[in-house]
Every structure is written in structure tokens, then in C-alpha cells.
Amino acid sequence: MSYYQWRVFARDVTVCCVGSVAMGLLLAAAADMAMPKKAQARPSELRMIERTVERAAGTRVLWAKGRTNGCTKSTLLGFYAPDKNTVIMCESNLRNSLPMAIELIKHEGWHAVQFRCNKGRPVLRDDQLRNGMRRKDKAILREAYPKHQHRLEAEARTVSQLPTQHYLAGVEAYCRYRT
């Protein structure tokens, strides 16, 4: 294509450059929204739990927005992936509930402690689990989990109810000699 007027040429180049930059920014924004993030602007209690799990258990904590990184069901709030040694928090499904996010990161973080610091075994005794679990958690356990996962899941549900300082002390204690 040949141009006979410099203005037409300049306009076409400008349109092409602006379009390319706009498309690049749009793709970058879309990719940024889809990628899991480290907790940034989160309340200090949540950040403290996250940092302790990452440091003591050596487990990454990622925050997934939307239906990415395994957060495909709207009912899934988060999970621990032992094969990737990662806790995934399904941020969009938590509905901006700080208490729910805190309890969940404690729960999933404790699964990391069980696997990374205690060889995949629970720490609490059966009587502690029975006395510490809420009635609704006992029902969920029976309905939604295979029997071989009951003790680990019961312990994570029980430990997630602890005050944060006690939870953090437990993580530190059980991961002190992690190999």
C-alpha cells in the first residue's frame, strides 16, 4: 500500500499503535485477573496466618480470583494441593467475608502442617477431635468425605476454630523440626 499524503500515513500508524497498545493492556489486565495472587491488601491477621504457613510449613498460599486454579465450583472455598504443596484460596467464593477467610486459611494451612510437618498424620487424639468439632462439621464429615480422610479433616476443622495466636503457636510447634 502506498501513501500519497503524509497525514493519512500518520493517522494509520497512530491508529495501529494505539490499537496495539490498547489490546496489549486489555490482555495484560485479563491475564492479571486470572492469575492467583499473593495476599496483598488483606487484613493483618490473615497476612500473619499466611506468612506463618508459608514460612513454617514451606507451603505457598495463593489467592485465585474467578474460576481459575481449581476453583471451578462456586461452593469450593479453598483447598490444599499436597502434590503442589500449595494452599489455594478461592477468593471470589469467599464473598468478602473476613471471618470465613480466616477460618478457611487456618483449615487449609493445617492440612499443609499435617502433610509437611507430621508425615500426613493428625496431631490431636480422638477425644480431642470429638469434643472440639461442631455438630455441623460432624455432619459434613460423614456426608462429604471418605472414611480414610475423617481424622485429618476433623482435625483441620477443629484447629481452624482456635484463636489465631494459639493456631500460629501450633503451626510453629509442629513444623519446628520439618525436614
Model-predicted segments: where are they?
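Short alpha-helix carrying the canonical HExxH Zn2+-binding catalytic motif
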Residues: 98-113
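Short N-terminal segments immediately surrounding and downstream of signal-peptide cleavage
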Residues: 32-57
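Catalytic Zn2+-binding segment of zinc metalloproteases
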Residues: 109-125
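Hydrophobic membrane-insertion alpha-helices, especially the h-region
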Residues: 15-28
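Second-shell loop/turn segments in exported
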Residues: 35-40, 90-95, 99-100, 142-147
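Metalloprotease/metallohydrolase-associated module, dominated by Zn2+-dependent proteases
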Residues: 23, 48-51, 57-59, 122-179
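N-terminal Sec-pathway targeting helices
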Residues: 2-17
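Active-site scaffold of zinc-dependent metalloenzymes
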Residues: 68-99, 115-116
